[in-house]
């Protein structure tokens, strides 16, 4: 990912525009979530071969004062672009926007993206649509995010807002001055671990990687921290020995990093760590004990049901045998009575 640039943002009117119809151009900071970048890259990979760029809608949140926009999700919008005209499926965009806002009521429309760094007249037309009243972001500015997706090159990202410009009101409808604004790609620890796992597969022939367990991930993180500490130690030693030039900014950064470390004695850290390990072992032992008791209870219940079923079957068979024996004795008595009657006759 390309490094971010520094901007000096001056808000000023750039052209004639009706009062109350122009979005504000106050200083703005844009925060981009990694999943939004991945969604844009996936859309770029699925584009038609004859398309130079694809566009889509940006969704996210906006701070209460409107000075910070966080881009969280995106969706693609179909469009056809030639040298003379551009056609955008605005009806599809409106329906998809309503669906996304219904599923995620905390998100709002914040702008649009394009997979090309070029800014032209068509970009101004689309920008004016997204920043307009009604279905646009008005009175807030619409963010235009450009993501360069040229094969073999680094992914370059730029963020812009626009101000109206034009000699007449008619020309202002298809014109806009794009103003670059600072942006930041922000991710948490879980997202960072996922990105590192994905990046580890880029050098493999199979383009696949294994997901580490918690213990393996902890071991890997500790090894990385130890490696960084060794690298910093070597740099400090080289500066002390006047083998490398000193950097005031780097020294201040290291000083601030050391100030964040808790001032605890190593013996206290070791004692707390051992206590934590013992607590974890106790919890694990109790969990295994409960699991074993549950398995024994299930097996005992199953055994009782099995034994109870077999005993009931044997008892029912004995009762049927007794009833059969009684029936046989009754038949013998009736046969003897008939024989006695025949003899008397």
UniProtKB/Swiss-Prot annotation:
Gene3D superfamilies: Cytidine Deaminase, domain 2. GO terms for molecular function: metallopeptidase activity; translation initiation factor activity; translation initiation factor binding. Residues 335-345 have a biased composition (Basic and acidic residues). It is found in: Cytoplasm. Residues 310-345 are annotated as: Disordered. Pfam families: JAB, MitMem_reg. Residues 30-166 form the MPN domain. Keywords: Cytoplasm, Initiation factor, Protein biosynthesis. GO terms for cellular component: eukaryotic 43S preinitiation complex; eukaryotic 48S preinitiation complex; eukaryotic translation initiation factor 3 complex, eIF3e; eukaryotic translation initiation factor 3 complex, eIF3m. One of its GO terms (biological process) is translational initiation. SMART domains: JAB_MPN (SM00232). InterPro entries: eIF3f, EIF3F/CSN6-like_C, JAMM/MPN+_dom, MPN. Residues 312-321 have a biased composition (Low complexity). Its main location: cytoplasm. It comes from the Eukaryota. Belongs to the eIF-3 subunit F family. Component of the eukaryotic translation initiation factor 3 (eIF-3) complex, which is involved in protein synthesis of a specialized repertoire of mRNAs and, together with other initiation factors, stimulates binding of mRNA and methionyl-tRNAi to the 40S ribosome. The eIF-3 complex specifically targets and initiates translation of a subset of mRNAs involved in cell proliferation. Component of the eukaryotic translation initiation factor 3 (eIF-3) complex. This is Eukaryotic translation initiation factor 3 subunit F. It comes from Aspergillus fumigatus (strain ATCC MYA-4609 / CBS 101355 / FGSC A1100 / Af293). The lineage of its organism: Eukaryota, Fungi, Dikarya, Ascomycota, Pezizomycotina.
């Amino acid at each position: 990912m390309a490094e971010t640039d520094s901007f000096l943002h001056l808000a000023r009117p750039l052209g004639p525009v009706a009062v109350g119809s122009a979005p504000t151009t106050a200083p703005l900071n844009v925060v981009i979530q990694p999943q939004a970048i991945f969604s844009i890259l996936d859309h770029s990979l699925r584009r038609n071969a004859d398309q130079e760029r694809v566009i889509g809608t940006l969704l996210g949140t906006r701070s209460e004062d409107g000075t910070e926009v966080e881009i969280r999700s995106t969706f693609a919008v179909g469009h056809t672009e030639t040298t003379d005209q551009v056609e955008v499926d605005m009806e599809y965009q409106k329906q998809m926007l309503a669906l996304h806002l219904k599923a995620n009521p905390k998100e709002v429309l914040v702008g649009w993206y394009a997979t090309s760094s070029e800014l032209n007249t068509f970009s101004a037309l689309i920008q004016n649509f997204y920043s307009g009243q009604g279905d646009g972001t008005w009175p807030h500015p619409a963010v235009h995010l450009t993501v360069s997706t040229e094969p073999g090159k680094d992914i370059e990202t730029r963020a812009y807002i626009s101000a109206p410009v034009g000699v007449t009101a008619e020309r202002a409808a298809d014109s806009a001055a794009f103003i670059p604004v600072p942006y930041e790609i922000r991710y948490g620890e879980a997202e960072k671990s996922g990105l590192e796992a994905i990046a580890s597969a880029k050098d493999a022939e199979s383009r696949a990687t294994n997901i580490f367990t918690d213990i393996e991930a902890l071991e890997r993180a500790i090894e990385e921290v130890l490696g960084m500490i060794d690298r910093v130690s070597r740099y400090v030693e080289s500066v002390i020995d006047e083998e490398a030039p000193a950097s005031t900014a780097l020294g201040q950064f290291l000083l601030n990093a050391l100030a964040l470390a808790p001032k605890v004695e190593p013996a206290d850290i070791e004692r707390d760590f051992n206590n934590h390990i013992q607590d974890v072992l106790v919890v694990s032992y109790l969990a295994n004990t409960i699991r074993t008791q549950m398995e024994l209870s299930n097996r005992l219940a199953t055994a009782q049901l099995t034994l109870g079923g077999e005993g009931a079957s044997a008892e029912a068979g004995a009762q049927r045998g007794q009833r059969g024996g009684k029936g046989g004795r009754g038949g013998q008595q009736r046969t003897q009575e008939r024989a006695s009657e025949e003899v008397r006759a």
